[in-house]
Structure formats: structure tokens, C-alpha cells
Amino acid sequence: MDITVNILLTIATAATPLLIAAIGELVVERSGVLNLGVEGMMIMGAVGGFGAGYLTGSPWIGLLAAIVVGALFSLLFAVMTLSLATNQVATGLSLTLLGLGLSGMIGTSFVGQPGVRLPNLDIPGLNSIPVVGKLIFGQDPLFYVSIGLTAAVMWFLFRTRTGLTLRSIGDSHASAHALGIKVIRYRYLAVIFGGACAGLAGGHLSLVYTPQWVENMSAGRGWIALALVVFASWRPWRVLAGAYIFGAVWIGQLHAQAFGIPVPSQFLSSLPYLATIVVLVLISRNKRLTMMNTPASLGQPFVPDR
């Protein structure tokens, strides 16, 4: 029983950064912007969060720094793609490469240094309930943030007028502009929110998941978050389910290696990425699934005077 509970705990921990980053990207894509820089923003959030936490001794300051760094990196993306109308795909890829390189340079002095960790929110009495106690009432703070964030985004997109406006921009920015909606303003806010979420996800990696700095510690999670949005057909609750499925795959390969299963470790390590590719291939083969809820203006630049 203890082994099962521990496995479920590690799955929740592995799923949390995927969920936070994917929910942020979902809001960005609902506005019609395709941000392929999630991986770069996540790794910059990781190094920023670890650095601030290490220098101040406070994981909470580290967490705030991770959010700010991710938001600033996304602001750069927004200026380039929204104000300067650069290609969103090329810009996102460039920022990912920049983030990976810059984080490696900044993090050189942090390699091998002891980190600070966000404490778990152990609720006295409740966390001693068999099985569910540790799973529900003994998690790290960002576990609860990720669940609350999913519920909040779901409510915002489908229960508020502002959310409806954001979705209308993603479906047809020209029509929204004709109605007097400030398309660029909405997209700026959506992109910054997505970047802040990516930074927060990176902060989880360096302050909770592995409280130390390791170069390229995001390990492709930003790309998996992007795939999760497509897998979920741009629906928040499906992102939640998908994050835990991919989290289980991620943890499954680690436990398989620990238990000495006679399969090459390189193959086991590639399982999360293979699962991502398989899911995207299956979805792309089904035209109905591909078009379901896809924002019609996704990836298209908007320049009012054209």
C-alpha cells in the first residue's frame, strides 16, 4: 500500500508542472497565438527561481522570481510577434533556444549548490487519513495551485464575458477587431499569463521536483505541455486529465528503471516523448479531432492597418 501511495504521490508531483504550463499555453492559444517558446520560458523560470531562492534562502521569493522571469520572457515574445508581427513559429523556437542557452550560462555558478524547497502543506489530522490523506492533504503548494488554476481558467473561458471575448479573438481576430475589441491588448495579456505559468512550472522543477539546478532540467516538458493542449482539444479539464496521464508515463519509466526491468534504459527514458508523438499522430489522423475546438486564427498574425 505504501508503495502505491508513493507512486501516486510522485505522479502528482510530475504532473503538476505539465498541468501549469499547459493551462497557460491553452489560454495563449485560445487567443489565437501559438507560443512555441514554452520550453525556453520554463527553463528560464527554473534557473530564475532556483537562483533567487538560493541567494535569499526563501523558496517563496524563488517562486515569485520564476513567475516574473517567465512573464518577462513571454513579454519579449509578445513584442516580437504582436507589435512587430514576426512569425510566431520561428520566434517561439528562437526563444526556446535562447532560453536553453541563457539558462545554462546563468546557472553555471549554481551547479552543485544546495537548493531550497517549498514545504508540503501537511494539514494536521487530515494528512493521516489512510491512502487519501497524503495524496490530497500532504502535497506541495503548487499541486493545489495547479488544480485551482485549471478550475479558474475553465470558469474564466466559459463563464465570463472577458473569456468569451478572448475566445472570439482566437476564432476570428478580424471580426473581433471590427466590433471594436482591442485584439492586441487581449493577446498581450494572454501571452504574459502563459509565460508566467511556464515560469511557475519551471519554478516547480527547481524548487519542488528537484530542488537543485541541473542544466536543461526542463527535459522537454515544455514541448509535452504544447502537445497536451492539442491532446485536450483546448479544453481545461482534458488538460488536467492529460497531464496526469503523461505524468504517469513519466514516473512509470523511472520506476521501471529502478525495478531493473530488462529493457534498455534509453528506451524507457524516451517513453514520455514517444507517447507524445503517438498521441499527436493519432489525433492528426482524425480530422474531426484535429478541428475540434481549434481556434481558427491560431498562429495567424494580426496587423490592424493591413
Residue ranges and their predicted role:
Residues M1-A21, L34, G48, L55-L64:
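Membrane-interfacial amphipathic/re-entrant helices at transmembrane-helix boundaries
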Residues I3-L8, L157, G194-A227, P262-V263:
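Inter-helical junctions in multi-pass inner-membrane proteins, predominant
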Residues A15-I23, G40-V47, A71-L76, G170, ...:
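Hydrophobic alpha-helical segments embedded in the membrane of multi-pass proteins
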Residues G57-L102, I245, W250:
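Alpha-helical transmembrane segments within multi-pass membrane transporters and channels
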Residues L100-R159, F259-L268, M292-R306:
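Transmembrane helix-bundle core of multi-pass membrane transporters
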Residues L135-W213, P236-A241:
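Helix-loop-helix "hairpin" substructures at the membrane interface of multi-pass membrane proteins
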Residues V153, D171-A178, K182-R185, A256-R306:
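Cytosolic-side transmembrane-helix boundaries in multi-pass membrane proteins
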